[in-house]
C-alpha cells in the first residue's frame, strides 16, 4: 500500500560504487546539459553556483536546483529515469515541474540522457539495460497484467476519489468550451464516444476496461443500451458494481472481472478508453483479433488511446522511461500507424474517424494536479508520505508537459468494417 514503496531501498545505493568519483559524475552530466541550449534553464549547483543554459528571457524557461551530488550519479546511470528519481528523492527541486519537463522535451534530441533521444554522444544512462530488463520481465500476460494493473489502480478507491471529478473518470476529458468544469468535460468525452458509436437503446455494447464505471453509467442512463464491461482490477470492479446498484442500472450492465482475451459473444458496439497503453506491443494484435472476433458485422468500435509519433515508436519500444518504471509497469505508448497495422493484420477493421485531444489532456492533468494538492491533508491521512506526493506531482505534470508540447497526444478513433450501412 502507500508505505510499501517508501520502504523500498534506494536503487542508487546498490550502484553507488560503479563510478567512484562524484566530481566525474558532475562533469559528465554537465557536459550533456550544456548541449541542451534550446530555451533557457537557470541551473543552481549544490555549491550555490548558478549557471544559465540557453538564452535568458526565452519564452520556454525553467529552473532546476540541484541539492545533492547524488543527482549527477542518478542521471549518469539512469538518464531521464534517474532524473525523475532524483526529484522524488529530493536530490533536486524546481519551482515548476511542468516548465522543467517542457524545457527537457524542447531539448530532447540534444541529450543522450533522455528516452527517445536520437543523440548518442557521451556515456550517460549507463545502466539503462537494468531498467529495460526489469520492464521486459513484466509483459502483460494474463497473470502479469493483473499485477501490473493492481500496482497502479489498486492504490485504493478512497485515494482516487480525493482528486478525480464526481464521475470518477481517470482519462482525458474533452472540453467543448473553456468555461466547462472537469466533470462536464468528462461527460462530453463520454458522449462524443457514444455519438461516434451511433449508440441506440437497441445496442449491446462491450466495454474493455471498466474504470470506475463512468462510461457504462453514462451510456445506459443517456441511451438506454445494455453494456458488458470487463476489468482486471478488483478494486475498480467492486466500486463499479456498487455504483451500478446505487444508480439502479445494474440490470442493464454485465460487469465482469475478466481478461479481455477471455471475452466471448457478439456485440453491436465496442468501446475502450485508455486501456490499450497497458497492452504492450506484444499483445496489440491479440487485442484487435479479439475485437474483430466479437464485434457484429455492421458494428462500430470507438477507442481512446494515448499516442506517440510514428517516427519515435521504435525508440520507445526499445527503451523505458520513468512513467513505465514507476507509474504504469508493462505499459507502452502506441503510434497511430502501429495501431492501424495491428487492426489490418487481424481483420478488416479500418479507421473511419480520428479526433485529437492532446491539449485537452494537458488541461485534464493540470486540473487533477490542482485538486490533488488541495487535498494533501486527506492524502496523508490515507498513509501516503511526502515521497509519494512528490512522485505523484512529478507524474501528473510530467505528463501535462508532454501533452502540452505535443510530444505525445491522445485520440478518439472510430473503426468499422467496409460497407457499413450505419455510416451511409
Regions found by a protein language model. Give the residues of each.
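Conserved SAM-binding loop of SAM-dependent methyltransferases across substrates and taxa
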Residues: 212-223
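Conserved beta-strand signature within the Rossmann-like core of class I S-adenosyl-L-methionine
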Residues: 298-306
Amino acid at each position: 500500500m502507500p508505505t510499501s514503496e517508501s520502504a523500498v531501498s534506494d536503487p542508487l545505493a546498490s550502484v553507488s560504487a560503479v563510478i567512484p568519483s562524484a566530481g566525474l559524475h558532475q562533469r559528465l552530466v554537465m557536459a550533456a546539459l550544456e548541449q541542451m541550449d534550446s530555451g533557457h534553464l537557470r541551473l543552481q549547483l549544490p555549491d550555490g553556483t548558478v549557471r544559465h543554459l540557453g538564452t535568458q528571457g526565452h519564452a520556454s524557461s525553467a529552473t532546476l536546483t540541484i541539492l545533492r551530488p547524488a543527482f549527477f550519479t542518478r542521471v549518469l546511470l539512469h538518464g531521464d529515469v534517474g532524473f525523475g528519481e532524483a526529484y522524488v528523492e529530493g536530490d533536486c527541486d524546481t519551482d515548476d515541474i511542468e516548465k522543467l519537463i517542457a524545457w527537457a522535451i524542447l531539448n530532447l534530441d540534444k541529450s543522450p540522457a533522455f528516452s527517445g533521444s536520437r543523440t548518442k554522444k557521451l556515456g550517460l544512462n549507463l545502466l539503462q539495460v537494468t531498467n529495460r530488463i526489469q520492464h521486459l520481465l513484466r509483459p502483460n500476460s494474463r497473470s502479469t497484467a493483473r499485477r501490473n494493473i493492481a500496482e497502479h489502480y489498486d492504490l485504493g478507491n478512497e485515494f482516487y476519489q480525493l482528486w478525480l471529478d464526481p464521475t470518477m473518470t481517470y482519462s482525458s476529458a474533452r472540453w467543448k468550451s473553456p468555461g466547462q468544469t472537469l466533470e462536464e468535460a468528462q461527460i462530453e468525452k463520454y458522449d462524443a464516444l457514444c455519438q461516434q458509436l451511433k449508440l441506440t437503446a437497441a445496442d449491446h455494447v462491450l466495454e474493455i476496461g471498466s474504470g470506475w464505471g463512468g462510461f457504462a453509467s453514462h451510456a445506459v442512463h443517456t441511451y438506454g443500451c445494455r453494456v458488458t464491461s470487463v476489468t482486471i482490477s478488483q478494486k475498480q470492479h467492486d466500486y463499479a458494481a456498487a455504483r451500478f446498484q446505487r444508480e439502479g442500472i445494474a440490470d442493464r450492465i454485465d460487469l465482469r472481472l475478466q481478461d479481455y482475451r477471455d471475452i466471448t459473444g457478439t456485440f453491436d458496439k465496442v468501446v475502450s478508453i485508455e486501456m490499450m497503453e497497458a497492452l504492450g506491443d506484444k499483445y496489440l494484435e491479440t487485442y484487435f483479433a479479439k475485437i474483430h472476433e466479437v464485434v457484429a458485422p455492421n458494428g462500430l468500435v470507438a477507442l481512446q488511446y494515448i499516442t506517440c509519433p510514428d517516427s519515435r515508436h521504435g525508440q520507445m519500444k526499445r527503451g523505458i522511461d520513468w512513467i513505465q518504471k514507476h507509474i504504469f509497469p508493462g505499459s507502452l505508448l502506441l503510434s497511430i500507424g502501429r495501431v492501424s497495422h495491428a487492426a489490418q493484420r487481424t481483420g478488416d477493421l479500418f479507421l473511419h474517424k480520428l479526433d485529437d485531444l492532446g491539449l485537452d489532456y494537458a488541461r485534464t492533468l493540470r486540473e487533477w494536479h490542482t485538486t490533488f494538492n488541495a487535498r494533501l491533508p486527506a492524502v496523508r491521512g490515507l498513509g501516503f508520505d511526502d515521497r509519494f506526493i512528490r512522485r505523484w506531482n512529478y507524474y501528473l505534470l510530467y505528463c501535462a508537459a508532454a501533452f502540452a508540447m505535443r510530444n505525445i497526444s491522445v485520440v478518439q478513433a472510430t473503426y468499422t468494417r467496409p460497407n457499413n450501412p450505419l455510416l451511409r
